[in-house]
Amino acid sequence: VSGPCAAVLLPDSWTPSHGELFRVWLAQALTKETGDWWLLREPYRLGWQVVSPTTGPMLVEPGDWASEDQDEEACLVRAVGFRPATEVLLAAATNGLDDHRFLAHLAVATARRYGGLIDLTGQLPVPPPLGVRALDAVESGVGMAQWQARVRETLRMLGGTWQEIPYLTDRGTTAIYHVVDPDLLAAWLTHPDFRMVK
């Protein structure tokens, strides 16, 4: 997968029949390719008013939610108010702007239909402020505070609800990812800096 990804976190456990009904709903807008890969057919059914977007396949993989880190799980549960039971993983095979939009529209539609929240799998991808180099901020922390302040300000301006979830990286440093409601992600879709986390 070379494109962006996200996950819709749901409070309820899904049985095989829930999964089957979900695939029936998906088939109203998408065409099943192979396995859990789907192609966009009718974007307007996802609330996307566009003609002939250029998108690649999208992985749509519902399953049980699991966490490998108890501290991260506890932070998530405190922040969102429930322990996710089901996760619908969404991942684009390609990385064009329409793939980012396809992913976001599908995440919003899924979260609204099933009462979920959207794990962006990273912080909202707002570009760093002028004078801050992304690589320096990520690798050495130089400018990271200013960048995160800009991200938080953008989140506040978008409306909706959002939570920052801290986690420990492989390098032993603390990073964050955002979990947002569908209204916030829908507002982010209209922002000039819109893109999803890759």
Regions found by a protein language model. Give the residues of each.
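Short, extreme N-terminal segment that most often corresponds to the first beta-strand
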Residues: 1-48, 192-198
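Short, intrinsically disordered low-complexity segments
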Residues: 20, 27-98
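Short, flexible beta-strand-to-coil junctions
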Residues: 1, 11-14, 43, 91-100, ...
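Ordered hydrophobic segments in well-structured contexts
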Residues: 4-10, 87-91, 105, 117-119
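Well-ordered, non-membrane alpha-helical segments in soluble/globular domains
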Residues: 18-23, 99-105
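Acidic, proline/glycine-rich low-complexity IDRs
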Residues: 1, 105-198
